[in-house]
Amino acid sequence: MNTKELIASELASIIDSLDQEAILKLLETPKNSEMGDIAFPAFSLAKVERKAPQMIAAELAEKMNSQAFEKVVATGPYVNFFLDKSAISAQVLQAVTTEKEHYADQNIGKQENVVIDMSSPNIAKPFSIGHLRSTVIGDSLSHIFQKIGYQTVKVNHLGDWGKQFGMLIVAYKKWGDEEAVKAHPIDELLKLYVRINAEAENDPSLDEEAREWFRKLENGDEEALALWQWFRDESLVEFNRLYNELKVEFDSYNGEAFYNDKMDAVVDILSEKGLLLESEGAQVVNLEKYGIEHPALIKKSDGATLYITRDLAAALYRKNEYQFAKSIYVVGQEQSAHFKQLKAVLQEMGYDWSDDITHVPFGLVTKEGKKLSTRKGNVILLEPTVAEAVSRAKVQIEAKNPELENKDQVAHAVGIGAIKFYDLKTDRTNGYDFDLEAMVSFEGETGPYVQYAYARIQSILRKADFKPETAGNYSLNDTESWEIIKLIQDFPRIINRAADNFEPSIIAKFAISLAQSFNKYYAHTRILDESPERDSRLALSYATAVVLKEALRLLGVEAPEKM
């Protein structure tokens, strides 16, 4: 039970009109620590008790007598709790030195499955910074859900089907060079894709030709299938090289094409349940009762199925295959309407588990305020960007620590970590402007800043030759260390909030706060000096390092021991 839960429990025993859960939600952290560590506002009780909130606060403060608090005082309409710093710091330091990286592990998920649909780049197109968002958010959510006791299944739903393959086949047959594609698959295929789109704007016959080739592909034409398979294989080799660099792995690469033979079954179920309506020759499902104006278009008048049909097939397959407790789609917010339709159609089909499906949308990445577009060739490609980030990180490491042994390895961890962290510290639904210089900076709210704080602590611990004792009698009661103790104690709740909101930025912001608090502590406290508090200060440094490293791991970011 953490401190807030303890306070909520104690208050619930003397408040009749609110239960522990409701009280927990009302608890606040005062902005000024002189007003206590935790505050309970009495406003919500005024109506029921028919008393002024100030009077209620005074009465509650008088009734509280737990040993866990230094004091409990009423200040206006608030009950302010001052915690026993020595007792709580002893508990927290004991917990972290004993549990180490397993501190804050929980078993909320009871080993149930969470399926995460993430990354999903388009075959034959470069892996851009736009795909990076889905990749790093999905990967971080996987770590977060595992931390609270779920098993995760990471699915890379590759964009390996669609009319764009018709366009690509036409372009390749007109202008393609097999050797050039083999040498630089994605670069060459992107050039062909951009060229055919540009020419199609003035020549509509190219569009028709592309549609015809895609029809051939759908009908199993040998030449079309061979080209499609080749484009897919070459692209995957390149994608996997990037995933290895990002240290992201997947449990399934079943993309759009995997569901080609599974869509007719979906149409049959919809038909059997009487859910399909005819509309201008097409077959649709009406979703007005869910407040969705546009019906879900299941089959076009020419018999072609659509994205939603494919996603329905994927949802049914995944439920059957993985028996998921949650199914998460980490896909841009421009797809929100699509996922509302998907859930509503599944609900219409009578599947209660549609409630377990969540679209986790994210905002756009821009460059100098401009939207990125593969079709127009205006993209930030990941591979050269990673190389540039690593190079910039190395320059700064050379300046800070020219004697460092494994500079290249550390620069790699810092450069890639910088890109990931910058993305993940942004509230997921917000976009951000891509600025490599800001990302790789060792100052400010960045990944390198947090990594450097961790490496600095490791240096302190090496100098002291500190090995934490699981039964160590560690305890602190000064104001500077108290700020750190409160953050470390809050880590389990932070992880839960990140999971509940599908929001890795909560962890990233926590890591920044913890690194800042430790750096402030380091500036004011002579940690290594001989004093009665020396071991406790070292234990606090150790606990901070453990939690910083674990917070970074939950974001998919490495923590180098030396920098």
UniProtKB/Swiss-Prot annotation:
Disulfide bonds: none annotated. GO terms for cellular component: cytoplasm. InterPro entries: Arg-tRNA-ligase (IPR001278), Arg-tRNA-synth_N (IPR005148), Arg-tRNA-synth_N_sf (IPR036695), ArgRS_core (IPR035684), DALR_anticod-bd (IPR008909), Rossmann-like_a/b/a_fold (IPR014729), tRNAsynth_Ia_anticodon-bd (IPR009080). Its main location: cytoplasm. It catalyses: tRNA(Arg) + L-arginine + ATP = L-arginyl-tRNA(Arg) + AMP + diphosphate. One of its GO terms (molecular function) is ATP binding. A motif ('HIGH' region) lies at residues 121-131. Pfam families: Arg_tRNA_synt_N, DALR_1, tRNA-synt_1d. Keywords: Aminoacyl-tRNA synthetase, ATP-binding, Cytoplasm, Ligase, Nucleotide-binding, Protein biosynthesis. It is an enzyme of class 6 (ligase). GO terms for biological process: arginyl-tRNA aminoacylation. HAMAP family: Arg_tRNA_synth. Belongs to the class-I aminoacyl-tRNA synthetase family. NCBIfam families: argS. This is Arginine--tRNA ligase. It comes from Streptococcus pneumoniae (strain Taiwan19F-14).
